[in-house]
Amino acid sequence: MRKSDRSFYNWLMTNRNSMAANEVQQFANNAFLDSSFPKQSSDFDELSQYLEENTTYLMSMTTFDEAWSLYNAER
């Protein structure tokens, strides 16, 4: 799979860390446990809306914005 074909969720899972040293790693850990997370999506608006309306595990949407920037840098 080329990096550009990778969904956001697939990329995010590369950041899982049981010792979660930062907020993106904690986000990845929590998204892994979220069975409703839109796993195939690479659409910023769809993901943002899902996170704003359906989750309580993000302390701030800034964490998603940071993760999205890192994701795009690798695409």
UniProtKB/Swiss-Prot annotation:
The source's superkingdom equals Bacteria
**Entries under Pfam families matching the protein:** YozE_SAM_like
Annotated TM spans: none
Family, per the entry?
Belongs to the UPF0346 family.
> Know the name of this protein?
UPF0346 protein LEUM_0763
Q: Which organism is it from?
A: Leuconostoc mesenteroides subsp. mesenteroides (strain ATCC 8293 / DSM 20343 / BCRC 11652 / CCM 1803 / JCM 6124 / NCDO 523 / NBRC 100496 / NCIMB 8023 / NCTC 12954 / NRRL B-1118 / 37Y)
Q: What is the lineage of its organism?
A: Bacteria, Bacillati, Bacillota, Bacilli, Lactobacillales
